[in-house]
């Protein structure tokens, strides 16, 4: 594809995106699937070649809901007001994006279904992740992704985690409100 674009003189006028809709477990956490909020499924590959773009990594938290706004921005089209997500074009250009997000929201609700994955929602920051399993259970998980990148040590309820848990729950409530997730009315976070 790259050779063709270069041959036709289109390479320097084309944004190339390689991505996926989700990651996948290959035995991690005893799972062979997707759906849970653990990093193996939550993180997705995203490679972007932008003519004149910055080479290297982007450390900011980007979601697949940002793809549309980014492509519209590149085309010079303003995103519709009702469209979720933000353009990460400034990040690709090596610029500082104004007021970039500090957290990501996740919600899996297809239960019961053939996969039998418990309903859960959560919030992830650059360092921490808080997950709440709900419906027929009420269970929480808290992970320090710097100290435990494999998410094997649940810190929820452990001494010394009270403040970060409180902050993450407040952020979780804020994100549920921001995305207008109806679950916030059924399962109120305390």
Predicted regions and their residues:
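Alpha-helical packing segments of well-folded alpha/beta enzyme cores
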Residues: 1, 67, 168-171
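Histidine-centered active-site microenvironments of extracellular/periplasmic hydrolases
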Residues: 2-53, 63
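Structured segments of extracytoplasmic/periplasmic soluble domains
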Residues: 4, 8, 74, 158, ...
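Active-site-proximal N-terminal segment of extracellular/periplasmic enzymes that hydrolyze or transfer
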Residues: 5, 150-161
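Residue-level signal for alpha-helix termini/capping positions
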Residues: 6, 10, 93-96, 160
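C-terminal cap/loop subdomain of S1 sulfatases and analogous C-terminal strand-loop tails that border
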Residues: 22-28, 49, 54, 65-68, ...
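Short, surface-exposed helix-loop/turn micro-motifs enriched in polar/charged residues
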Residues: 38, 59, 79-81
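A generic structural signal for short coil/turn motifs at secondary-structure boundaries
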Residues: 55-58, 153
């Amino acid at each position: 594809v790259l050779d063709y674009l270069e041959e036709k003189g289109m390479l320097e006028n084309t944004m190339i995106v390689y991505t996926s809709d989700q990651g996948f477990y290959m035995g991690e956490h005893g799972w062979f699937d997707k759906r849970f909020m653990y990093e193996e499924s939550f993180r997705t590959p995203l490679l972007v070649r932008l003519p004149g773009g910055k080479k290297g990594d982007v450390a900011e938290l980007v979601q697949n809901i940002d793809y549309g706004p980014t492509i519209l921005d590149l085309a010079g089209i303003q995103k519709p007001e009702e469209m979720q997500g933000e353009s990460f074009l400034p990040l690709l250009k090596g610029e500082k994006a104004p007021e970039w997000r500090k957290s990501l929201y996740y919600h899996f609700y297809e239960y019961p279904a053939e996969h039998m994955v418990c309903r859960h929602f959560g919030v992830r920051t650059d360092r921490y992740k808080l997950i709440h399993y709900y419906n027929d259970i009420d269970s929480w998980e808290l992970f320090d992704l710097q100290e435990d990148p494999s998410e094997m040590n649940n810190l929820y309820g452990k001494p010394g985690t009270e403040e970060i848990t409180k902050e993450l729950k407040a952020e979780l409530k804020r994100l549920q409100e921001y995305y207008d997730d109806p679950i916030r009315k059924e399962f109120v976070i305390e």
